[in-house]
Amino acid sequence: IRSGRDADAYEPDRDGDELPQGRFLDRERSWLAFNERVLELAEDPATPILERANFLAIFASNLDEFFMVRVAGLKRRIATGVATRSASGLQPREVLDLIWTRSRELMARHAACYQQDIAPDLSDEGIQLIRWPDLTEKEQARLFTFFRQRVFPVLTPLAVDPAHPFPYISGLSLNLAVVVRNPVSGHRHFARVKVPPLLTRFLEASPQRYVPIEDIIAAHLEELFPGMEVLAHHMFRVTRNEDLEVEEDDAENLLQALEKELMRRRFGPPVRLEVEESIDPYVLDLLVRELKVSDAEVYPLPGPLELTGLFAIASLDRPELKFPKFIAGTHRDLAEVESASAPDIFAALRERDVLLHHPYDSFSTSVQAFLEQAAGDPDVLAIKQTLYRTSGDSPIVDALIDAAESGKQVLVLVEIKARFDEQANIKWARKLEEAGCHVVYGLVGLKTHCKLSLVVRQEGDTLRRYSHVGTGNYHPKTARLYEDLGLLTGDPQVGADLSDLFNRLSGYSRRETYRRLLVAPKSLRDGLIARINKEIAHHRAGRPAYVRFKVNSMVDEAIIDACCRAAQAGVPVDIWVRGICAIRPASRLSENIRVRSILGRFLEHSRVFSFGNGGEPEVWFGSADMMHRNLDRRIEALVRVTDPAHRAALSRLLETGMADTTASWHLGPDGNWTRHATDADGQPLRHVQEMLIEARRRRRATP
């Protein structure tokens, strides 16, 4: 494992050609560019209006997490003196300045998009997001009653004076800073009122007219401070360091000793203060002083703050204002055309492997049905399963409980530390244990991120293993919104690999090599680099050669260096990335590298790795992104695709995603992304997701 090395002081291997400086783009800048692409979808008038509201909420939620984790980590590195340059050559201080400048621009654009486009356009469709003064007297009277009955009892006004120290402001909470005056003494006082997070963010004043909850509280502050004059109130919101796990960057290993105390406290230091533009300088000064934030961390914005509340608006039942409804179909290899009975998935897998592409192929009639059938089948002896993120009421969890209760051996490998999901994960892990499942909590120091299921079944005199290897979590809800791949197979090699890997995860196996899997942290990075290098040899020998990756993030320096070497040697390298990309394309050092990004109604989540291999293409897919944490500190698995039809389908997918006729963003050598949504004649380019939806619809229409 390379994790002992300092990731920020990455030294390339000194074999072969010297690679030029400047081949890495800054990862934080690249992440902000990714969130800008989300914002562009919200700004695009061609996106349905409720989906635009949804993208505004996604942008806000993404940025919250970015500040809580990445910005907090940078500040921590600066404060503790672990300030090595990043791979892009910038000092942490320079990166922080860049983030502050860029995020300020993006947050201003985000607020303007809401004020100038989204709110007025929603109003045109009869969904009015209004402020307290815009309400009718009747609406105000109704909301006053609501305030008295449902809001007032849960509010806690906290005074600030010599007897009452400044209260602790929890991360991401909405707060009112209130200035009151005592009419007797004439003294001004400051108080803080927290907006209860469990109350609905936008309340319906009358049908299709919504008002932010903080407006209702602000309009009735006299109720909270009887006998006092309310002089002013201002909204503010604090973002804190809440990255509970020390991960993400190898540099942070040095910090663990220094950080133990801090990490034990849930309350990290503030990293951002959002305030309304109209805030009184006296109040702002007090907040800045008490919260100990710098001027650069203060973000004045037009209200309302905290637009993640738009998720609720986006989920209103107005289908005509959303993307056209799409219902996933059952994969044709699993569909029982003849009968209405549930298909026998094991019988189907004895005939052939099934390549699933969610959400176009239904999760519930494939992966979920596979596990449910296994749970109810008397011939199934054992089920082994990894769970990284799932929902507590998940049918997957129910199936595993049923299996354990009917006497089957059930091993569940649970990853408790899926960030920000810890509570939920602990809950259903207990539920599984109580039912008699063997629950294992991963390997020390390694997160289990691979997506695997293994079913062992008695068939005559032999035991047969059936497997599922995927790119996405076993989470039926996200399976409808995330684009993911999965392989259901009865192949004995994959079955043997999964048996070995599960033994490694639950016991003391030291196996490092597998038949059809590449497994991190040992063989995955080296396996991919060896294959990239092999493409150079194929190219020099005049055989077909290419490298095509589809990933969520492309940051790992060793993988990037291998790609740059291949590109320098003349091998075409195509990278289809959703989020961060630190590889600099199409410059004189890498003219053979093309980078594209696609965002849309589904979150592109699958990871695919394809190699020309001298005319015999090799294709892998699985759970791993090209990041340190995935390759060094997580158990990840990629599976080799052996069925020629499956290889061809995945190659077609990658070609379509990279094609100039497909709508996408293109990364330039300067690190800037440009959106390509129309052709030279101004006609809209096709979106890969729309093409796949269309293909599924056509397939269903043909008998």
Curated annotation (Swiss-Prot):
Its EC number is 2.7.4.1. Mg(2+) binds at R389, R419. GO terms for molecular function: ATP binding; metal ion binding; polyphosphate kinase activity. Its cofactor is Mg(2+). One of its GO terms (cellular component) is polyphosphate kinase complex. Residues 1-21 are annotated as: Disordered. Keywords: ATP-binding, Kinase, Magnesium, Metal-binding, Nucleotide-binding, Phosphoprotein, Transferase. GO terms for biological process: polyphosphate biosynthetic process. Gene3D superfamilies: Endonuclease Chain A, Polyphosphate kinase middle domain, Polyphosphate kinase N-terminal domain. It comes from the Bacteria. InterPro entries: PP_kinase (IPR003414), PP_kinase_C_1 (IPR041108), PP_kinase_middle (IPR024953), PP_kinase_middle_dom_sf (IPR036830), PPK_C_dom2 (IPR025200), PPK_N_dom (IPR025198), PPK_N_dom_sf (IPR036832). ATP binds at N62, Y482, R578, H605. The active site is at H449. Catalyzes the reversible transfer of the terminal phosphate of ATP to form a long-chain polyphosphate (polyP). Belongs to the polyphosphate kinase 1 (PPK1) family. This is Polyphosphate kinase. It comes from Streptomyces griseus.
